[in-house]
Regions:
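Hydrophobic anchor at the beta1->P-loop junction of P-loop NTPases
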Residues: 5
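A basic- and aromatic-enriched beta-loop-alpha substructure that forms the phosphate/nucleotide-
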Residues: 63-101, 125
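NTP-dependent small-molecule kinase module
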Residues: 135-210
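Post-Walker A alpha-helix
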Residues: 16-17
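A glycine- and Lys/Arg-enriched "phosphate-lid" helix/loop adjacent to the NTP-binding pocket
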Residues: 88-159
Length: 210
C-alpha cells in the first residue's frame, strides 16, 4: 500500500513522515529536495520562475517518478505524488510563468506517466495548513532556495490543493489541520484506522478532532 502525504510548502510533510516512520511499520520516501539543491535548481526556480519553471517541474516529475517506480513491497509513506507536481506546473502556467507550449508538453508527458502510475495513487494524507502558517514555517526553517517564496505564491498553491483534494471522491483522503497538529498516539490511531493499518495488538482511540 502506498500513502502519499500532500500539502503546501511548509505544511509539515517531512515532520509527519518521520513521525509515522517511528510509529508504524513502513518504508518512507522523502521528496528529493537534496537532489534539486545539488544542481541549484530550487534556488534558481524561486529567483526566476518564468525562466526555470519548465526545467524545474520536469525535473521534479522525473525524479519523483523514479522513486515511485522503485518502491518496495508493503506499506510506503511517500512525500508528495506526481499529481501535486501538476499543481505547481498549473500555477506557473496560470501566472504566465510557463508558456503554453511548455505547459502542453508537460501535460502530455505527465498524462502518459500518470496513466501508468495512477493505480499507485489511491491513499492521501492532506496536511492542510493556512498559507500564513506555511509562510512562517518556511522562514523559520530557512531552507536553501526558499527565502524568496512570497506569501501570495503559497496562497495560490493552497487554493489549488483545496480544489484538488477537498472534494475528491476518487481517492481515499484523510484531511488533517496542519496548523495545530499534535504529534501523538491519537494521530497515529487515526491514520491506522483510515488506511486499515491496524493489527490485532493495537489499542486505539479515534476520538480525534481536526
Amino acid at each position: 500500500m502506498n500513502i502519499h502525504i500532500e500539502g503546501n510548502i511548509g505544511a509539515g510533510k517531512s515532520t509527519l513522515l518521520n513521525f509515522i516512520k517511528e510509529n508504524i511499520e513502513c518504508s518512507i520516501s522523502q521528496e528529493p529536495v537534496d537532489e534539486w539543491e545539488k544542481i541549484n535548481l530550487l534556488d534558481n526556480f524561486y529567483k526566476d520562475i518564468s525562466r526555470w519553471s519548465f526545467t524545474f517541474q520536469m525535473n521534479c516529475f522525473i525524479s519523483r517518478t523514479q522513486k515511485v517506480d522503485n518502491l518496495p513491497e508493503g506499506v510506503n509513506i511517500i512525500e508528495r505524488s506526481i499529481m501535486s507536481d501538476r499543481i505547481f506546473a498549473k500555477n506557473c502556467y496560470k501566472n504566465d510563468q510557463m508558456t503554453k507550449i511548455e505547459y502542453d508538453i508537460y501535460l502530455k508527458w505527465s498524462k502518459w506517466l500518470y496513466e501508468k502510475l495512477s493505480k499507485k495513487i489511491k491513499n492521501i494524507i492532506y496536511l492542510r495548513s493556512t498559507p500564513q502558517v506555511s509562510y512562517e514555517r518556511i522562514k523559520m526553517r530557512n531552507r536553501n532556495g526558499e527565502s524568496d517564496i512570497p506569501l501570495e505564491y503559497l496562497e495560490q498553491i493552497h487554493k489549488l490543493h483545496d480544489e484538488w483534494l477537498l472534494d475528491n471522491d476518487d481517492i481515499n483522503i484523510l484531511v488533517i489541520d496542519a496548523d495545530n497538529l499534535i504529534y501523538d498516539k491519537d494521530i497515529i490511531d487515526v491514520i491506522k484506522t483510515k488506511f486499515c493499518l491496524l493489527n490485532k495488538n493495537d489499542s486505539i482511540n479515534i476520538d480525534y478532532h481536526f
